[in-house]
């Protein structure tokens, strides 16, 4: 790798440092909005278990990310990477270096991993929408909610298949979604703790951050320039200011919204206003488990 491109292992290579910095904001925002992670948070049997799980995961992910990065370095050193294939550098190295049998096993494990992640995300998205519909009173009854959840899972899966069939860059899709997450996650998390943050304040912070991020984001430049009168006002596209701007501006606007906000949300009300769908209502007595003839 060093003989091919000395910058691949140069710790002071500025483009590499910039990439690592904005990827931190991208992944942080994406994970804060990852409903699969929030499901695991609420599935933990207590705070000690949750802290221990996050600690083990944080220690485990470091060597995994380092190893994944080295696969990219190896792919570049072997001359396997092009702008169109840089997002699949891992598979390029596997198919080039490893025997076919080992490569098949690796690809099979990766497919199983993707299926597991997709299953988590599909269920998380459909359950999120289902819960909101139940909260709004649009759907009543456990059976109707189950059918709706299954139907939403199928629709989301079909949408993912349609998008995947277009041949878009995996890296481009991830970074586009991460930009949205980078602009939204601070108002979302801040709202869990700040009593003075209103819905409008959180929305203003999210939209302001997203506007700045899109203005700099290179991958959406072609779409943004289609808006009349916008093209000449856009700054030079760059990833680092896109993600830093999205997170920083949303944080700043959200902080201002908290400072000027007067509506105080009572978090104690959650214990009385929020209940599990499995809990019986006042009109519905709990089941006794007895079976009558």
Predicted regions and their residues:
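Membrane-embedded helix-loop-helix hairpins and adjacent transmembrane boundary segments
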Residues: 1-293
């Amino acid at each position: 790798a060093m003989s091919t491109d000395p910058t691949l292992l140069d710790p002071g290579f500025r483009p590499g440092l910039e990439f690592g910095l904005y990827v931190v904001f991208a992944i942080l925002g994406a994970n804060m909005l990852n409903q699969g992670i929030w499901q695991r948070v609420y599935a933990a049997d207590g705070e000690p278990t949750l802290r221990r799980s996050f600690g083990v995961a944080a220690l485990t992910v470091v060597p995994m990310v380092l190893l994944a990065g080295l696969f990219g370095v190896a792919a570049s050193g072997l001359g396997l990477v092009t702008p169109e294939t840089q997002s699949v550098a891992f598979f390029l190295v596997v198919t080039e270096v490893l025997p076919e049998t080992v490569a098949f096993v690796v690809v099979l494990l990766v497919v199983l991993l993707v299926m597991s992640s997709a299953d988590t995300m599909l269920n998380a998205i459909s359950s999120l929408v289902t819960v909101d519909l139940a909260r709004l009173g649009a759907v009543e009854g456990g059976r109707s909610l189950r059918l709706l959840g299954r139907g939403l899972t199928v629709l989301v899966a079909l949408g993912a298949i349609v998008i995947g069939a277009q041949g878009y860059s995996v890296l481009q899709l991830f970074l586009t979604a991460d930009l949205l997450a980078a602009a939204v996650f601070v108002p979302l998390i801040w709202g869990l703790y700040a009593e003075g943050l209103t819905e409008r304040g959180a929305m203003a912070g999210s939209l302001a951050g997203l506007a700045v991020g899109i203005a700099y984001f290179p991958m959406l430049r072609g779409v943004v320039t289609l808006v009349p009168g916008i093209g000449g006002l856009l700054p030079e596209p760059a990833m680092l200011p896109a993600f830093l701007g999205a997170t920083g501006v949303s944080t700043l606007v959200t902080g201002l919204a908290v400072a000027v906000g007067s509506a105080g949300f009572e978090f104690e009300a959650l214990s009385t206003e929020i209940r599990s769908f499995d809990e019986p209502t006042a009109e519905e007595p709990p089941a006794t488990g007895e079976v009558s003839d």
